[in-house]
Amino acid sequence: MDFKRVSYLGWCFVLVLVGLWMVEAKGKDEEDDDVVVHEWKEYSAVYNFGDSNSDTGTFSAAFAAVFPPNAQSFPGNLLPKRNCDGRLIIDFICEELRMPYLSSYLDSIDSNYNYGANFAAGGSSIRQTGFSPIHFGLQISQFIQFKSRTMALYNQTSHTGVDVPVKSRLPKSMDFSNALYTIDIGQNDLSFGFMSSDPRSIRSTIPDILTQFSLGLQHNFMTLVLVLLQQLFKEGARFFWIHNTGPIGCLPRQNMVNKTTPEDLDSAGCRNFENEIAQEFNKQLKEIVFELRQKLAPAMFTYVDVYSAKYELIKNARNQGEYVS
């Protein structure tokens, strides 16, 4: 495939996201067709959590090098760190906020965390069982350690009056509560389920997956999601930008690993079953976001419909001069 065209497709996707940039999800009792548009806010930093959709160096630092064609159209043509020929959505978000690209928390070479850090890792999932050991809960633990060590350094230097050069590569202690927390995770939980168990049982695992996600933001897959998000809230996070999962049934590997018949596909050539599961996941994720908005009232939660943006690009690829095979 022509990678210049792929980059063009990526730009189209970003334009769709920019259209959603400051759109906040509304509550269950409000009309879905309505949106609330907020004024532009200046964030002091960005902290990202997720999988290969937003990994800017964790996998390459922790496990194995990322080889071309990855990064071949990345600005500066640097050492490949992303599973993408160019920039990821998180890169465009940083550009839009006029910030440098995020350094991976585990990348020890030439990293700068003055404007945030990236904890996402290729293959990561919400639950601990998956393709990668760096699951969502561990990413949050890494963030907590990062914040704790940063705060300790500032406290130490404030008492001694001695400035430490490394502070120039770290965020200010007050930046954590004024940062944007971006999250794009969950696709690997579903993909791992498709590969390792009866596909028809995947739907029943979604509530457990999202429980763990919620626990991470607060403090168990819908319950874990809830707990994890609450955990981030306890650490001072107030501005959340949460992507739903993409159309998994449109991934080429789904047609490669499954015996596919024409009846299994929709008009865009995507597998119906996998996409139905993804849509069910997104429906429950959206409900979790609404619940968190009510529970954690001071915080702002923005739910981003990445599924629709990606599906429309895939469905209309020919109209954009791109051929998808």
Predicted features and spans:
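Conserved active-site regions of diverse hydrolases
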Residues: D2-S325
